Structures are given as structure tokens and as C-alpha cells.
């Protein structure tokens, strides 16, 4: 599977501006505060740093999580890694495509590769830990530099 490397401009520079990012965990949330919901996924940089994802198992519908709790488990070539939630809430939908097509996570990390949809329970507190807008790309560059992979 080909995807962006951790040092590639695509992994670092393409961060949709409408999302909120928990940089240290390399996850994002597309928040609809009016509706009280968020769609959650893994960043392109997070995927580039992790490598190929062979299996993705999000938490079940109805699971209640705090910001930073494990929202999914992904199986990589040589390890299994917990994916942390950028927001607190209850899982209300799991991406149905991921069961049969886990590659969607790295093919379209900000589109069809989303993990879960959540009903927000503490957005006012959670948002203080998330980056948004112009602060995101510099933080992604810094995270990529700190976690650069040896060729």
C-alpha cells in the first residue's frame, strides 16, 4: 500500500482547516457543535508514521469515552496500536466500510476513512486541547520532525 511518508508535504501540509486536531495523538474531529456530534479519524501524518494498517477495529456503538481514551485499535505490520479519541462522547456510529476495507483509513483519511461518529459530551472542555485553523500545519511540521522516520 502506498501512502504519504512522514516527511512528505502531503502528510504534513494537507490538513483540512475545518477539523480540530489532537496533534500528539494524530487524530482529528470534524465537529458539528450545533448538532452536538463529531466525526473522528486518524491524520494522514499519523498514518504515515504508523505504516500500513491491516485491520481497524473501532469501539462499538454505545461506548462512552473521555478525550484521550482508546477509540479504536489498529493492526500494523509488526504491532497493534490504540487510537486515542480527540473528543469525549458516546460512539453513535462506526464506519461500516472499515470491516471489509481497512485500507480506506490511509486512502482517504479525511473522507471515507473516518473511524466513528460521536455524540459530544464535553465539547467546551475538549476544544481547549485541540488545534484548529492556522495553528495546525506548523504543529504538524513539528510533530513530523520530532517523529521523523529513518530511511
Feature map (PLM): residue ranges:
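Short, well-structured beta-strand-loop connectors
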Residues: 59-74, 90-92
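Short beta-strands and strand-coil junctions in structured, solvent-facing domains, enriched
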Residues: 80, 125-126
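Small beta-strand-rich domains/subdomains or short beta-sheet motifs embedded
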Residues: 57, 75, 81-85
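Short, conserved beta-turn/loop elements at beta-strand boundaries and strand-helix junctions
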Residues: 31-34, 94-100, 125
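Acidic, low-complexity mobile loops and tails
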Residues: 2-67, 112-122, 131-134, 141-151
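Mid-chain, well-packed structural core segment of small domains
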Residues: 81-112
Amino acid at each position: 500500500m502506498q501512502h504519504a511518508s512522514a516527511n512528505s508535504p502531503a502528510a504534513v501540509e494537507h490538513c483540512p482547516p475545518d477539523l480540530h486536531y489532537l496533534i500528539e495523538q494524530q487524530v482529528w474531529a470534524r465537529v458539528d457543535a450545533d448538532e452536538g456530534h463529531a466525526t473522528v479519524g486518524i491524520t494522514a501524518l499519523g498514518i504515515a508514521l504508523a505504516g500500513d494498517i491491516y485491520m481497524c477495529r473501532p469501539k462499538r456503538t454505545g461506548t462512552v469515552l473521555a478525550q484521550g481514551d482508546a477509540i479504536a485499535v489498529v493492526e500494523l505490520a509488526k504491532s497493534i496500536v490504540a487510537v486515542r479519541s480527540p473528543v469525549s462522547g458516546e460512539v453513535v456510529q462506526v464506519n461500516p466500510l472499515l470491516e471489509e476495507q481497512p485500507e480506506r483509513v490511509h486512502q482517504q483519511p479525511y473522507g471515507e476513512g473516518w473511524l466513528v461518529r460521536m455524540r459530544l459530551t464535553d465539547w467546551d472542555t475538549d476544544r481547549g486541547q485541540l488545534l484548529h485553523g492556522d495553528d495546525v500545519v506548523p504543529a504538524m511540521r513539528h510533530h513530523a520532525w520530532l517523529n521523523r522516520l529513518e530511511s
